[in-house]
Amino acid sequence: MLLLGLLLLLPLLAGARLLWNWWKLRSLHLPPLAPGFLHLLQPDLPIYLLGLTQKFGPIYRLHLGLQDVVVLNSKRTIEEAMVKKWADFAGRPEPLTYKLVSRNYPDLSLGDYSLLWKAHKKLTRSALLLGIRDSMEPVVEQLTQEFCERMRAQPGTPVAIEEEFSLLTCSIICYLTFGDKIKDDNLMPAYYKCIQEVLKTWSHWSIQIVDVIPFLRFFPNPGLRRLKQAIEKRDHIVEMQLRQHKESLVAGQWRDMMDYMLQGVAQPSMEEGSGQLLEGHVHMAAVDLLIGGTETTANTLSWAVVFLLHHPEIQQRLQEELDHELGPGASSSRVPYKDRARLPLLNATIAEVLRLRPVVPLALPHRTTRPSSISGYDIPEGTVIIPNLQGAHLDETVWERPHEFWPDRFLEPGKNSRALAFGCGARVCLGEPLARLELFVVLTRLLQAFTLLPSGDALPSLQPLPHCSVILKMQPFQVRLQPRGMGAHSPGQSQ
């Protein structure tokens, strides 16, 4: 009964807000408005938003609950906003759950743009690209090799590989952020469980609806209570690591990213007016790395497996490419990441998976920091902007046969520059270098060692789960990993 009342009240509130916005903005040339208030109920929101371009063009407004937002559905409009006019569009909105998850915004992913945010980004990027530059690839190689050995111990047995990939990517992030001592302390299962709990709770509809209909936070909400509890567990884990790192820190030396960042915040700020970075910024940088770097990469790896199960001819070509470069059965040989151009089809396959299933199909919302414009339309200050990255990747004016899995499109010079899988501009994903390294190493090792086979007669679905929040999750599936050289069928042969 309460839900019915809320659904009846929503159009009235939205209508009142619409009239107020119209009165304030009546003199501006705004993007066209897609009518309706229940767009969030669409099961596949990125594709639905792309479909609206047929009537309204690549940029339009719509109402998400009580919020008036502008949606960008093409590479041209996204790059105009996020690259050419990045300073106008670098802000973040401030919904309730962002405040909860980000500890009131000392955070890179969810924090608003400022000079302090810029200094925070610079420190975290340095920790990734300088602090662990020499250890990043060896750690990914070592943990991927251990993953393959675990899979080899159960040859041909159906495996829920999405969970295995999540454990692998979580291990990589934890090693690089906290150091290899976490393995001795047997903390990995606790870290993994905590991350899963935060992501699952945060993405639930009972949490998401509070961000678009803010007054609902005053009603009893068990989901919000669970989210707060999950965040407390998360913070306890990170604070424990901070304490241990501070106790053993040696000036001028660093073992991992947390060491590097702790020494960075101890230095006075070099940029005038930016303020001083604090331990809370190190805390939230670690959280961003853990949450942002676990499920996103694992999800992309899982989609790669699903696409290769549907396209065994591509899998066979990939294995032939690996055998040509490394020799058949050369499981201990490797292609260093700096020499990745030696495997053009593998790189093209990764690019195609990222095109069809971008890391985040709808980029986290941006907010205009001052009045601006896109494609000749006025965009007022404080407007929420949603870049539809998946929509841009399916734009028929840019991509030939956009809905088809066709890695060869990226073998043509210059095609890779058209993709926006990790975003662009000031808010581009900081973890992109690590994610690309992981995708390359894991898929290389996996296809060197195994042939991917369906677990039964039916192939896994290519349709994502409906009503996904941040990432496009696939339907649950299993795969058989048949060690190569054990008399398995070629992936190109019928079963």
Swiss-Prot record:
Changing C429 to M/S/T: Loss of progesterone 21-hydroxylase activity and loss of P450 absorption. It is found in: Endoplasmic reticulum membrane; Microsome membrane. GO terms for biological process: glucocorticoid biosynthetic process; mineralocorticoid biosynthetic process; steroid biosynthetic process; steroid metabolic process; sterol metabolic process. The keyword Heme applies. Changing L143P: In AH3; loss of activity. The keyword NADP does not apply. One of its GO terms (molecular function) is heme binding. Changing R355C: In AH3; salt wasting form. Changing I78T: In AH3; simple virilizing form. Changing S269T: In allele CYP21A2*5. Changing G65E: In AH3; no activity. 17alpha-hydroxyprogesterone binds at R234. A cytochrome P450 monooxygenase that plays a major role in adrenal steroidogenesis. Mechanistically, uses molecular oxygen inserting one oxygen atom into a substrate, and reducing the second into a water molecule, with two electrons provided by NADPH via cytochrome P450 reductase (CPR; NADPH-ferrihemoprotein reductase). Belongs to the cytochrome P450 family. It is linked to Adrenal hyperplasia 3: A form of congenital adrenal hyperplasia, a common recessive disease due to defective synthesis of cortisol. Congenital adrenal hyperplasia is characterized by androgen excess leading to ambiguous genitalia in affected females, rapid somatic growth during childhood in both sexes with premature closure of the epiphyses and short adult stature. The leucine-rich hydrophobic amino acid N-terminal region probably helps to anchor the protein to the microsomal membrane. This is Steroid 21-hydroxylase. It comes from Homo sapiens (Human).
